Amino acid sequence: QEKTYESLAASPFNKIRFCVFPKHYVYNLKEPAQYPFEIRENSPWSPSDFETEKLEKAPRNMFGGIDAMIENPDEVWDYTRPNPSYFEHIENTIARLGTMGIQADLILFHPYDRWGYSRMNLEQQNFYLRYVVNRFSAYHNVWWAMANEFDLFRWKPVSEWESNAETVCRQDPYRHLRSIHNCMTMYDHSRGWITHCSLQRIDLYRTAENVEIWRPQYGKPCVLDEIAYEGNLPFGWGNISGEEITRRFWEPYTRGGYGQHGGTY
């Protein structure tokens, strides 16, 4: 993490996106040092069940996703007992980024999950959201990203996202910026709670050029939070050149939008 701070301090970037929950994906198979919720007594699961060697042998899809999940997360996690140490670490990160002049775009939900956090019921989701917003909203540099790739939550209807957004808006007296990010299907960014469009390319050719369509359609700032990553991975989302990502930055910029860089070497 210190290397990340050093890199940010030497760069011109002034916003970073990061997840509240740990991430389960190819190249992210180690167990986190802490968990966001307390483990129940007599839990049928333990961290040793997710040893890296076991996960490396699990089946994966063409995008790098790996099939693994706690069978009954409600029997493992006490969703009414957030882990204070876990959230203190996030809070310290937000505060430190603020001293560097960097915006902290917090991703509240994501589907890359083996622990079951993406499967919380609506009551559990909104308890978690109240805790997070109450704890972090006082920081001037916080943004709320309702989800990364919301449409990969195949089991979660739009009504739940709207309920989540209502909770965030109600709990946040400072009206921080709010968005929701897509994979292949765009969210309706005309919704009143959305302050800006957080977008991923949905056209493999017009990766950023569609800003000229989205800006007049939604009448809101358009941030290309995912236009693929500069890197050398064997996946199409993570192997474009530095020259190509530079071009993809200029495409939205000249149309009144914004781009975000990511490296996957």
Each model region followed by its residue ranges:
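Catalytic-core region of carbohydrate-active enzymes that cleave or remodel glycosidic bonds
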Residues: 102, 173-175, 191-265
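Active-site mouth of glycoside hydrolases
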Residues: 1-207
